[in-house]
Curated annotation (Swiss-Prot):
The keyword Flavoprotein does not apply. It comes from Chiloscyllium indicum (Slender bamboo shark). Crystallins are the dominant structural components of the vertebrate eye lens. The lineage of its organism: Eukaryota, Metazoa, Chordata, Craniata, Vertebrata. Belongs to the beta/gamma-crystallin family. The gene is GS-2. InterPro entries: Beta/Gamma-Crystallin, Beta/gamma_crystallin, G_crystallin-like. Residues 2-40, 41-83, 89-129, 130-172 form the Beta/gamma crystallin 'Greek key' domain. This is Gamma-crystallin S-2. GO terms for molecular function: structural constituent of eye lens. The keyword Transferase does not apply. Residues 84-88 are annotated as: Connecting peptide. GO terms for biological process: lens development in camera-type eye; visual perception. It comes from the Eukaryota. Keywords: Eye lens protein, Repeat. It holds the Pfam family Crystall.
Length: 173
């Protein structure tokens, strides 16, 4: 079972809250989050309640201030600890919504979507195994989107504000 500790102040100071499962609304437990300890597993943090807004993936370790996890501010309002999966890594991406247009299937990382797909936009995706992360820019940079197994008919289904994806990779457990 995963465990994460949220602290209101930097360097693990101030009020704290320990969490060991998914939580759709963290606001009753703390008003701001400036440092985090991930004691086991890996976690997905969300800027807004109900797993919405900016996303951050944290692995086991210490994060003494929000800039260490590439946070834009001290706002963490929901979190998930993904369950372990033995599925193979496989994902299809499409150039149009509702699985339309050109399709490519991937089983490995992609540092540049444009170099492999010849498009910068991914409008829909079908994740058939394990977990993946989409990045806004090439070489795993920029805003990220956590992709669980399932069908994503539009980029808004994975929390995107735009269809532009520059790179993606698998999450190794």
């Amino acid at each position: 079972m995963g465990k994460i500790i949220f602290y209101e102040d930097r360097n693990f100071q101030g009020r704290n809250y320990e969490c060991s499962s998914d939580c759709a609304d963290l606001s009753p437990y703390f008003s701001r989050c400036n440092s985090i300890r991930v004691e086991s597993d890996w976690w997905v943090l969300y800027e807004k309640p109900n797993y919405m807004g900016y996303q951050h993936v944290l692995t086991r370790g210490e994060y003494p201030d929000y800039q260490r996890w590439m946070g834009f501010n001290d706002c963490v309002r929901s979190c998930r600890v993904p369950t372990h999966t033995q599925r193979p890594y496989r994902m299809r991406i499409y150039e149009r919504p509702d699985f339309g247009g050109q399709m490519m299937e991937f089983m490995d990382v992609c540092p540049s979507v444009y170099d492999r797909f010849r498009y910068r936009d991914i409008h829909s995706s079908h994740v058939m195994g394990a977990y993946w992360i989409f990045y806004e820019h090439p070489n795993y940079r920029g805003r990220l989107y956590f992709m669980r197994p399932g069908e994503y008919r539009r980029y808004s289904d994975w929390g995107g504000y735009s269809s532009t994806i520059g790179s993606f990779r698998r999450i190794m457990e």
